Structures are given as C-alpha cells and as structure tokens.
From Swiss-Prot:
Residues given in the record as Mg(2+) binding sites: D31, E95
Pfam families reported in the protein's UniProt record: Endonuclease_5
Reactions catalysed according to its record: Endonucleolytic cleavage at apurinic or apyrimidinic sites to products with a 5'-phosphate
Entry's Gene Ontology molecular function annotations: deoxyribonuclease V activity; magnesium ion binding; RNA endonuclease activity, producing 5'-phosphomonoesters; single-stranded RNA binding
Chief site of localization: cytoplasm
Protein's organism: Pyrococcus abyssi (strain GE5 / Orsay)
Protein name: Endonuclease V
Annotated signal peptide: none
Keyword Zinc: no
Keywords linked to the UniProt accession: Cytoplasm, DNA damage, DNA repair, Endonuclease, Hydrolase, Magnesium, Metal-binding, Nuclease
InterPro entries: Endonuclease-V
Listed cofactors: Mg(2+)
Length: 194
C-alpha cells in the first residue's frame, strides 16, 4: 500500500508550481500535536512583516493514520484542512516538509496543492534522501517550497519572521497545539526559544 502511495506522491510532485509571491500582508502558520489518536491543531495568523498576531484558532479531532516517516501528509492533512477552512491569509507556513522530501512531495506541498495557496515547508530536521537543492537552512529551520512560491521568496519570508532561530508564528502555533499557552495569550515573548 505504501508503495502505491509513494507513486502517487511522485506524480503529484509534478503539479507543484514555483512562482514569485509579491503581495504578502497576512501569514498563517499551522502545527499539530498528538495524544494517542487525538490531534490538536493550531493556526496562527499574523501581519507581515511585523508579525502582529491577528487571530489564533485551536481545534481537536481524531486521526486514524499512524505516524510513518515520509508519509506524514496522510496523518496531518485532515486536521490542517479543518483549522484553515474559511480563513484568509496570503501564505501558509506548515510545520513539515514541502519539496525537501525524498519524493519532492511532503505535507506542505500536499496542503498547498489542495488549498491552491502559497505554502512554505519548515522543519527542524531533514529526511533521509532529501535532494540537496530542495531546501535552505534559515536559522534552525529547514525551509522548502510547499507550493505556489519560490524558494527565494520562502527564505525571504522566513528570515523576516525568525525569533530565536525559528519562525515566530510557527513557534506560537507549536505552543498552542501543545497547550503550553492559551488562545488568549496571543503574543510570544521575544528572545525565548521553545
């Protein structure tokens, strides 16, 4: 079964578009945490480039697919689509790889293809077999194209959002998804790392 899914990933990777993103005023970031089969997904929308938090949203849902490296998109797509539904943003930052993936089609690419919006993949570690020209290291983050953005634009956006080596909206989404802060706490202290 996974072999067939891997083939589908390879085919879908050919549908990923890289293009310049010019007007960016709202950035969204999304992260998912788990307790057993329960997913807690957090969305943070902030202004760009000053990163003032405009909205936060947290949802919980059941997931049925287990964590399998390089097939992360099968586990996280549904929670991310639920939390982003009806929300407005120019670019979405996903905690997970985009083209920095052995089959050039990670979670950020899958979400970008479904939403039809520019997406950036951001991760703390590389996957084994990742093509070298598919990412850039920015601070502590491995940044890659999800969909509808160039690597140059993705890097430029992430550089402006860095806080302690990682994009501030993604750090906030991580803390929200893990319940370390509540939705009412819509700021993240600067110079603190998670």
């Amino acid at each position: 079964m996974l072999e067939k899914i891997a083939e589908v990933q390879k085919k879908l990777s050919k549908r990923i578009v890289e293009k310049e993103v010019r007007m960016v005023s709202k950035i969204a970031a999304v992260d998912v945490s788990y307790k057993g089969n329960k997913a807690r997904v957090a969305l943070v929308i902030c202004s760009f480039p000053d990163c003032k938090v405009l909205k936060t949203k947290v949802l919980e849902t059941e997931v049925s697919f287990p964590y399998i490296p390089t097939f992360f998109f099968l586990r996280e797509t549904r929670p991310i689509l639920l939390v982003t539904k009806g929300e407005e943003f120019d670019v979405l930052i996903v905690e997970g790889h985009g083209k920095a993936h052995p089959r050039k089609y990670g979670l950020a690419s899958h979400i970008g293809l479904i939403l039809g919006k520019p997406t950036i993949g951001v991760a703390k570690k590389l996957l084994r077999g990742t093509p070298e020209n598919s990412y850039r290291k920015v601070g502590k983050a491995y940044v890659s194209v999800g969909n509808m953005i160039t690597l140059k634009d993705a890097v430029r956006i992430i550089e402006k959002l860095l806080d302690g080596g990682y994009p501030k909206p993604l750090k906030l989404a991580d803390k929200l998804s893990k319940g370390k802060i509540s939705e009412d706490e819509n700021t993240l202290p600067s110079d603190k790392t998670s």
